[in-house]
Amino acid sequence: MKSFPRADRIGSSIQRGVSEILRKGLGDPRLDMATITGVKVSRDLGVAYVYYVIPGDTAGRAAAAAGFKSAEGFIKRSLAGMLKMKYMPDIRFRYDESFAYGQSIDTVLRELQTEKDDVPDSGRPPEDD
C-alpha cells in the first residue's frame, strides 16, 4: 500500500492526542483500560480509523465499542483543539484484531514448545532410514 506522508503525520498526531485524552480520563469506566494501537487516515484525510485493544472478553470489547461510540464527538472536539487543523477528520474506532491474532499465535507456539519439552530425549542422534 502506498504511503502518504501527510496522512501518516496526521495519524501519529491523532494517536498521541487520543492516547492523551484517554490517559486524562473520559469519566467512562468502559474505556479505562483501552489502549490505542494505531491510527490509519484515509488518503483524502476525511476519516481517521483509530484502532484500540482492551483486555477481557467479547463483552468488554462490546462495552468499549459502545463507550467509544458515545465519546466520538467529545474526542473529535478535543482533538480539534489540540491539533489546530482546519478540517478535522471523522473519527471511527475499530477493535484491533491483529492483537488478538498475535496472542493466538503466541498460544500455539507455547503449546508446541510444551509438547516438545515433554518428549523424552534419548541422547542419541536420529537414525537415517
Swiss-Prot record:
GO terms for molecular function: ribosomal small subunit binding. GO terms for cellular component: cytosol. The keyword NADP does not apply. The keyword Cytoplasm applies. Gene3D superfamilies: 3.30.300.20. It is found in: Cytoplasm. Keywords: Cytoplasm, Ribosome biogenesis. InterPro entries: KH_dom-like_a/b (IPR015946), RbfA (IPR000238), RbfA_dom_sf (IPR023799), Ribosome-bd_factorA_CS (IPR020053). It holds the Pfam family RBFA. PROSITE patterns: RBFA. Coiled coil: none annotated. Monomer. Binds 30S ribosomal subunits, but not 50S ribosomal subunits or 70S ribosomes. Belongs to the RbfA family. One of several proteins that assist in the late maturation steps of the functional core of the 30S ribosomal subunit. Associates with free 30S ribosomal subunits (but not with 30S subunits that are part of 70S ribosomes or polysomes). Required for efficient processing of 16S rRNA. May interact with the 5'-terminal helix region of 16S rRNA. This is Ribosome-binding factor A. It comes from Desulfosudis oleivorans (strain DSM 6200 / JCM 39069 / Hxd3) (Desulfococcus oleovorans). The lineage of its organism: Bacteria, Pseudomonadati, Thermodesulfobacteriota, Desulfobacteria, Desulfobacterales. The gene is rbfA.
